[in-house]
Amino acid sequence: EQDIRLMKQNNLNTVRNSHYPTHPYWYHLCDLYGLYIIDEANIESHGMGYGAASLAKDSTWLPAHMDRVQRMYERSKNHPAIIIWSLGNEAGNGINFERTYDWMKSVEQSRPVQYERAEQQYNTDIYCRMYRSVDELLAYAHQTSPKVYRPFIMTEYLHTMGNSGGGLKEYMEVFESEPVVQGGCIWDWV
């Protein structure tokens, strides 16, 4: 509970449950304190790569992907703090995420569904890349080409490796000045 109080005191309004759903009490506290949740299915397989070897492209893994997404949804669907469903993290993109997205959209019409590796494909409602530079965010906000245009929320940024949170002011300026760039989740809260 103290973590949530500290987050609220520091004007944080959203947490991403990464890379799996968390304890039921956490959801209760977020409902109580008004902290938004991006709830994420327990699908994380970046060790398998993002190319042809990705489990996302191997339909024998579809039942496992579907089971994890369905369990997340059924367990958490009645929590008002959840504002976005996430299909997983860094597990490539392919048929398994297309099918889990289709299933989520068939049962859930009120909240968006995101998947970071889907980038600009159809199986995400939000463009949710990680570790984009301020210049990349501005380029997205000001694009004029006929790309798919979705809200941009960084699933991770300001990882403590490297610049250890440097540049927060510049990111905040973009979040506040560009309506399509809606913020992000700092990696990570410990």
Model-predicted segments: where are they?
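Active-site-adjacent "gating/activation" loops or surface patches in catalytic cores
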Residues: 1
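Metal- or metallocofactor-binding catalytic centers and their adjacent structured scaffolds
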Residues: 10
